[in-house]
Amino acid sequence: PNIGEAPIGEPLDAEIEGEVLLKMTDNITTDHIIPATSDILMYRSNIRKLSEFTLSRVDDTFAERALHADGGVLVAGENYGQGSSREHAAMCPQFLGIEAVLAQSFARIHKANLFNFGILPLAIDEETYERIEQGDDVEVVTDVAPAIAAGEREFTIRVNDDWEATAELDASERERRILEAGGKLRLTKEQYSGSGG
């Protein structure tokens, strides 16, 4: 059968650390993230299969590397996630273990989808973008979950235990609650189970 369960994210940890699995340029579209061809979109109800095509137009080794990495981060330039509002463009990276995207800027709708699937979207400046490389180890030094709950905007990231930079989270109170829960699906599930008595 070609239908699988939608992935439900885990509640956000205090720590986010992982390898930069892919460094991308400006204007990466949702079509780059999940190609919109019929032979691929036929799997849109099977996230395990669909995720195999994640970012294949940028790097066809990405999905396999991400699955074996046990978590990681993406780095991008300006306007990450522009184009159509395809939820799968956030759902598939989440399934592959992506915990954060560090980008110079985000397309608004895709950024909302990153929140909805529990992926932390952090804005970085051009200098940080130029300096960070694919394969680097990135740690969000700030205790992530408590900082999000407290409404913090600035987060310190450490790269290769060598240098640090500041990244910024621009999020509403509702988006912060969704992130903390591990995504909209888990938040909704928690709310329903909590109200069920």
What is each of the regions a protein language model found here?
Residues 1-197:
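Fe-S-dependent hydro-lyases/dehydratases of central metabolism
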